[in-house]
Amino acid sequence: MEYITAFRKPEQTQYGMSCIDNVCKPLVINQFWLYDSLPDTSRMKEALAELLDGYPTLAGRISDNGIVCNNTGILWEEADFRKFRIKDIQRQKIPEKRFHAVFDNKAALAGKFPLMSVKISRLEDGAVLNVKCSHFCADGNAFYTMMENWASLARTGVLVRMPDYDEYAVRNALAASDVYRSLVSSDMQTVCSMLESEGMFRIGFTAIFRMALQKLLGLDRRLSAPLFVPEREIACIRDRVLRSSGRKVGRNAVLCSMAVDYLRDRMGWRGKTVSMVHTVDNRGRKAGIGADYMGNASFTVTPVSFSADLPIERMALLIDEDLKDVLSHDREERYFALYCAMIEKKLPYLPFDLDSAWSLHPTTLIVNNCLKFNVYGTDFGTGGPVFAWPLDFGDPVRFWPSPPGEDGVYVYFTGRFA
């Protein structure tokens, strides 16, 4: 093992993190890629050192509610497993421990361990790459952009996109909000009443107990085999909706309706109302948070509820319409302020019913659409990955890019939905 530090050795600075960063602080992004060629690790390390010039938080250490950008470095490890071939690596589950990069999250949170670690495992005819990164530093958008930049530096010597480090972005975005100012200056009883009037759900003991029990039993880590949805099938449903209603619907709405249709009998949803929760990226949506913002800018929004008995086309139209309403400018501005005030004051509320999401027969599901991430954009100069495993977060439904050559989408289910 060794530490990789920034090439130009920047001066030490303190970077303040936002309230959205802080709520993600305990989490770790854990991504694996499989390659059918052996990587040039010397080139990868050189490019990583150059990358860290533009990503100072990754080479720093946590200090209170911020990161000391002291260029202490990230952890790098290489290992040989030449007895393994690509065909020996299972794709239906996250790779076994021998291929995992070391990451001590408890020590990282205490400022005593790197915020990112990398492991290259060489096989007889390829390699497994594992990158672990503290969610405190980045959300999915920022992480995969960073990986794309690293690969581009190794391959061409040029960054694809310049990261936008602005520690005041979220704070400035909230400064103009009357709702936010009112909430943070009010007493707890007033704030709780306001949150409940806005449709927020209080997190109860039952939900916490169910979460803890399922985590203890490992049920939350169950991962289904991917359900492959061809692009032509998505296009066909979009066309049917257009012909029947005269309205266009997005790809996401179609995939959501197909997921519910697939789960309806498996989950016993006939005759029931389901609530679908989406994760939304606020980059380019919220004034002041740019497209290349380096940090956390994504969170769940209020759910869309509908009958599970509806035809796919009707579900897709309803989901699309409701999401557009939820993400309309005025509603989104208000919700952004509510959400940030809620997490800043550490109040036990969520925009959806956690008890319903973690019950033995859940009717609330969280959907995480990862299709906009360039997951397969990690060609370091010796060829791109042939497979990328889904993240091991417990989102019940995840839309994931299919491997190169497959024209469609992988849909994964986790926990009780698997």
Regions picked out by a protein language model, each given a short descriptive name:
Residues 1-192, 218-228, 234-292, 350-418:
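Non-catalytic N-terminal regions of enzymes
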Residues 117-124, 197, 205, 209:
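A short acidic-Thr-Gly-centered motif at the start of a beta-strand
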Residues 224, 293-375:
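Helical lid/core segments from catalytic subdomains that handle acyl or acyl-like groups
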